[in-house]
A protein has these predicted regions:
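Bacterial carbohydrate/catabolite-sensing allosteric modules
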Residues: 1-175
Length: 175
């Protein structure tokens, strides 16, 4: 799904793409491994996209998206597009951009991830990746049921679910 969003930005001729990500913890000491950042970096390297000074991580929240975007703006050199690892991060980033009179998508394109309801109500409406939360819940419930029923042992697994890019109005093709 990350690759789909980045391919979309590449098709729109973006050669400088930023990343605003988050960290989640399983408990106070164990960091949950989210591969979105790794996929982002690998895609950029393979496609000769500049990303290095535009890579920031905080939390998966509006506030963190806002703070990371302010930090990026204060660096002075903005990318032409930003991939946000969640819609709340993107919504916070959008607010920071608007407060600094940086127009989306005219000055910078913005893509979120999750397709939360609020993403279609932002100005402009946010282009995002739809991740099927209901399907994730079904898989999770099935796994827990099988473990409790002793049909399977509790082993780590990674499940890839189909995601869809929802194209709205926060991205623009550049020359």
């Amino acid at each position: 799904a990350v690759t789909d969003a980045l391919t979309y930005l590449k098709i729109l001729n973006h050669k400088k793409i930023g990343f605003l990500g988050g960290r989640e913890y399983i408990d106070d000491s164990i960091l949950y491994h989210d591969n979105r950042k790794e996929i982002f970096i690998e895609f950029c390297k393979q496609n000769d996209i500049k990303y290095e000074p535009y890579l920031l991580e905080g939390e998966f929240s509006n506030e963190s998206g806002y703070t990371m975007m302010i930090d990026m703006i204060n660096q002075g050199d903005l990318p032409t597009a930003i991939f946000c690892a969640s819609d709340p991060i993107a919504i916070g980033a959008l607010r920071a951009l608007q407060e600094r009179n940086i127009r989306v998508p005219e000055d910078i394109s913005l893509v979120g991830f999750d397709d939360i309801k609020a993403a279609s109500f932002t100005t402009p409406p946010l282009t995002t990746v739809f991740a099927p939360a209901d399907l994730m819940g079904e898989y999770g419930a099935s796994i827990v049921y099988n473990i409790l029923s002793r049909y399977s042992s509790p082993t780590p697994m990674q499940i890839t679910l189909p995601c869809v890019l929802i194209e709205r109005e926060s991205c623009k093709e550049i020359d």
